[in-house]
């Protein structure tokens, strides 16, 4: 995939870059694998705002993705590589030998006509899915389960890859894209290869309107609000925040404070992410 630039015919176009979509082979999605996607606008089931800066955006349909890959031993042919508006990576449509169709997230190097398979006896080949205990140490992997049978949860965004560092007993040690070193049960499955759409990190949004197309609303600084809206608000003219340290809209320290809950899985983290 390449990044496409434009002639600077307007201030918005001047900085904007988009993906070339060279790898896309089909524009209309598989109808049987579509579901309606209702907009949440950052609200919970009570209608209360729980996530700020969300709302609007282009209408989307959800593509049902197979994250579990439990059709063991049945080969599937890659029929197409498609765009998915709900994620940064591309998706691949698989036609299984028994006639079933499923989507998977597309790793780098997976092309139309390739054959993929899942199961403990699968080859170490891009797109194949197998338990961590059957994958050689040093292999790049993605779409990793955290619990056996739950489906891939880790390393699913464009260009991401984890590395299998060691296998010891019932656990495998992974190095995640964040730099975190973590143990995962060796029975958990992962897919071989690095995530596709590598150039995604080089895309420049270019203008505010494009953020709105994505369903992202403006992020307003607290210092320009009124005191009723934010602890940083108020004052005459351009005033400082009036506190020793910046805080969130709810008064908690914004910089340096730990936000991660204590979990039973903390003991599986060998080294925290690099900041």
Swiss-Prot record:
Q: Where is this region: Disordered?
A: 224-251
What InterPro entries has UniProt attached to this entry? NA-bd_OB-fold, Rib_uL2_dom2, Ribosomal_uL2, Ribosomal_uL2_bac/org-type, Ribosomal_uL2_C, Ribosomal_uL2_CS, Ribosomal_uL2_dom3, Ribosomal_uL2_RNA-bd_dom
**Annotated keywords:** Ribonucleoprotein, Ribosomal protein, RNA-binding, rRNA-binding
Protein family (similarity comment): Belongs to the universal ribosomal protein uL2 family.
Q: What's this chain's function? A: One of the primary rRNA binding proteins. Required for association of the 30S and 50S subunits to form the 70S ribosome, for tRNA binding and peptide bond formation. It has been suggested to have peptidyltransferase activity; this is somewhat controversial. Makes several contacts with the 16S rRNA in the 70S ribosome.
Q: What does the subunit comment say?
A: Part of the 50S ribosomal subunit. Forms a bridge to the 30S subunit in the 70S ribosome.
**What's the protein here called?**
Large ribosomal subunit protein uL2
Gene symbol?
rplB
């Amino acid at each position: 995939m390449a990044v496409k630039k434009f002639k600077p015919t307007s201030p918005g176009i001047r900085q904007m870059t988009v993906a070339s979509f060279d790898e896309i082979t089909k524009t209309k999605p598989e109808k049987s694998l579509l579901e309606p996607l209702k907009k949440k606008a950052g609200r919970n089931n009570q209608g209360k705002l729980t996530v700020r800066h969300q709302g609007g955006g282009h209408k989307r349909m959800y593509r049902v993705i197979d994250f579990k890959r439990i059709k063991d031993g049945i080969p599937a042919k890659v029929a197409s590589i498609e765009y998915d508006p709900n994620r940064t990576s591309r998706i691949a449509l698989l036609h299984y030998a028994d006639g079933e169709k499923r989507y998977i997230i597309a790793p780098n190097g997976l092309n139309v006509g390739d054959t993929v398979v899942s199961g403990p006896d699968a080859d170490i080949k891009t797109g194949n899915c197998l338990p961590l205990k059957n994958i050689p140490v040093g292999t790049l992997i993605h779409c990793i389960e955290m619990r056996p049978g739950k489906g891939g949860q880790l390393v699913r965004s464009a260009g991401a890859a984890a590395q299998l560092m060691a296998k010891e007993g019932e656990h495998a040690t992974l190095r995640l894209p964040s730099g975190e070193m973590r143990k995962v049960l060796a029975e958990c499955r992962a897919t071989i290869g690095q995530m596709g759409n590598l150039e995604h990190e080089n895309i420049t949004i270019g203008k505010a309107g494009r953020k709105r197309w994505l369903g992202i609303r403006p992020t307003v600084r607290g210092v320009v609000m009124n005191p009723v809206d934010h602890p940083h608000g108020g004052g005459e003219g351009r005033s400082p925040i009036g506190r020793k340290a910046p805080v969130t809209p709810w008064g908690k320290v914004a910089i340096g404070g730990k936000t991660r809950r204590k979990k039973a899985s903390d003991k599986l983290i060998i080294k925290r992410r690099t900041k």
